[in-house]
Structure formats: structure tokens, C-alpha cells
């Protein structure tokens, strides 16, 4: 069964093709093999945690490790961080455009809290500690994070810097 392409795998393949055309096939194979192994090792995770593992965490680890075959560790880290930052900028622009719709901005706090509790809740491996709710304020500390935990488990906690 073919995996759904994530933004990380797409960006990794683009980097391999543009910067390392002679090694692109080898890099893509290394990425695919590592990602398959990581997915197999984490197959028992909850459905909620799988959402994060498949879309972001494990492709990030596989890309980071594969890039280290052709560049220094710090450069590979910056490349993978660049992928994430580019997605964040794009998402920010999309949200900012939506918030120009009259009245929509009033709905955002409630929707944000509800979706964050759902997607980043205990079932997904997070341990949120809500510090303040109400009066238009929601403060939360994440006491446990599967992004950090998984990256640390695989020897690359720096991916969460």
C-alpha cells in the first residue's frame, strides 16, 4: 500500500533532486526504507498519536537521517527546520486571510481551544496542564510531548529545538 505523501517527504525529495541529483535515487531509497522501519516500530501507537507520527514526526526523522548521508548534521537540521517553517508561514498566511471574513475572528478562540484539546490531548501522547481558562484567555503548558519524546527516543532531540 502506497503511503500518503507528506509535506516533509515532498520537500525532502525536492531537496534531493535539486541539490544532490546524482544521489537522489539513493537518498530517496534511504528515506523510504527508514520511514517504513519507523512506521513499523510505531504501529502500535494510538490512532490519535499515529496522526502526528505519520504526518510529521517520523517523516522528519527519516529526512533528517537521510540528509546526514550527504551533509553535516547541523545543515541537515536547518534543512528540516526550513521545511517546517515554510509550512508554518503558509498556514499563517491562510489563517490571516480567513480572519478577514467579518465576524470569523470571534469564533477562533473557541474553535482553537476545542481542536487543540482534541488533537493535542492525552490520547495523542500529550500531557497538557491548563493554567488559565476563561475571560478570553487560555494558557496551557505541555508537560509531555510525543514530538520530543519520539525524537529523543531515536537520538535526535535537536529536531524539537
List PLM regions with ranges.
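N-terminal leader/assembly segments
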Residues: 1-90
